[in-house]
Amino acid sequence: MRDDVTQMKWWGWGDEHTEFDASDKPFLMPFITRELGLSEEDEEVVRPVSIEEVKLPGQSLNQDFLDEARSALREDQVKTSDKERLIHSYGKSFRDLWRVRRGIVDSSPDCVVYPESED
């Protein structure tokens, strides 16, 4: 993996250090509310649970596979941390994000293997 690749959010889209600032867009929420037929109560921002509250299913690592992968690849290409597993537990569809933002994770990978490059 390249060093300049940033970590994606476990609870949403994009880089974890980037947020959408709507403070200079006063008409955005009224527009969304009107177009989606929502009420003012629906405008409440729901924050995700903390990452510490998310309980992942246990890992079932095949140590022989893990050893072989780590010997064939660079160290930064094979990840087994809970955060890496969480990031790759779901896609980024509305349903997936709704579940993960509430800490609902029914399955997750045992490890994550990255390609050498995106080329």
Where do the model's predicted regions map?
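Noncatalytic alpha-helical scaffold of FAD-dependent oxidoreductases
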Residues: 1-119
